[in-house]
Amino acid sequence: MLQPKRTKFRKQQKMRNRGLAHRGNKVSFGEFGLQATSRGRVTARQIEAGRRAISRHIKRGGKIWIRIFPDKPITQKPLEVRMGKGKGSVEYWVAQIQPGRVLYEITGVKEELAREAFARAAAKMPVQTTFVEKQVM
């Protein structure tokens, strides 16, 4: 599962997830992409589930790029523990997603197969997504 090798600080504050994605909003590496149309938090497990769904559907053909990385730690206190006594321990990692962000990219497969593969990955995501193609200038 994806998570940072090391961080400056173990825990982070919540912060707000506002605005649109100005970086990572275009298909850069592949021919087709899965782009978020809503905002949210995607966990490392969800990213991996989406990757597996895509790779199982396209079988041997094509190459996949994961364009998001879970770099935000989410903490949780154990069950039945009273309030206070400090912040809980890191439970899992998430990537914060703004509308417009490209989550996955594929190349080397037909458009129809790419659409089906991304539909399967989109079912695993907690954000709404859309299929996008590389814009040739």
From Swiss-Prot:
Cellular component GO terms, alphabetical: cytosolic large ribosomal subunit
Signal peptide: none
SUPFAM superfamilies, sorted: Ribosomal protein L16p/L10e
Its biological purpose: Binds 23S rRNA and is also seen to make contacts with the A and possibly P site tRNAs.
Annotated Pfam families: Ribosomal_L16
Family that this chain belongs to: Belongs to the universal ribosomal protein uL16 family.
GO terms of molecular function: rRNA binding; structural constituent of ribosome; tRNA binding
NCBIfam families attached to this UniProt entry: rplP_bact (TIGR01164)
Subunit description: Part of the 50S ribosomal subunit.
Gene3D superfamilies: Ribosomal protein L10e/L16
Gene Ontology annotations of biological process type: translation
The keyword Ribonucleoprotein is annotated on this UniProt entry: yes
Keywords: Ribonucleoprotein, Ribosomal protein, RNA-binding, rRNA-binding, tRNA-binding
Entries under InterPro entries matching the protein: Ribosomal_uL16 (IPR047873), Ribosomal_uL16_bact-type (IPR000114), Ribosomal_uL16_CS (IPR020798), Ribosomal_uL16_dom (IPR016180), Ribosomal_uL16_sf (IPR036920)
UniProt-recorded name of the protein: Large ribosomal subunit protein uL16
Region described as Disordered: spans on this chain: 1-20
